[in-house]
Amino acid sequence: MKKENAIRYYRKFSGADAYILGFVYKHDLYCITVDEIMPRFMRVEKSSSKKGGHEKLQFRLNNALKEQLIRKGAEKIGTETDLLEIAGNKGVSFERMIYRINGQEPRPKDSVRFDKGGDININGVEYQIKLDGAQIVEFRTLNKIQKERKSA
């Protein structure tokens, strides 16, 4: 599957209304809310052979993109160290920070597949939460959802 097709299917199947994106820049932690994850923020990568070596979309930001997001209004919400103090996994730590900022209790890890809803609901809006370096979706998951919807 090509990157463009994977992005199109991801957007078509996503249960999120918007996205909360996080990244570290010069040791500060930022977040920004966006309607869509832009294609230039995504790369096609392969998971490790230990995890099956499957192709996937990965959320990746270089410094130029981080600077652009800061100019567009990304807010500083902490430091890189804050990500390490909450949990062993930076992505989980970021999600917990977003829950805490919004006065909510975190959901159990990976309790909802991306096509069924977001990671957090804020005022009736479903948001997916992604920290720089996070997996967006494996191509095989997109294929599985396609087959499920065709047979439904």
Where are these regions (language model features)?
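A short, charged, amphipathic alpha-helix used as a generic interaction element across diverse proteins
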Residues: 2, 6-12
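Active-site beta-strand-loop-beta-strand hairpin of nuclease catalytic cores
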Residues: 114-134
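A short, surface-exposed interaction/processing loop segment used at functional sites
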Residues: 41-57
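Catalytic cores of nucleic-acid endonucleases
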Residues: 19, 85-88, 129-152
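Acidic-basic catalytic patches of nuclease active cores, encompassing PD-(D/E)XK
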Residues: 15, 52-111, 150
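Acidic, metal-binding active-site segment of PIN/NYN-like and related structure-specific nucleases
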Residues: 13, 24-26, 30-43
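Short intrinsically disordered terminal tails
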Residues: 1-4, 48-51, 152
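Nuclease-adjacent, charged terminal/linker segments that flank catalytic cores
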Residues: 19-23, 29-30, 49-53
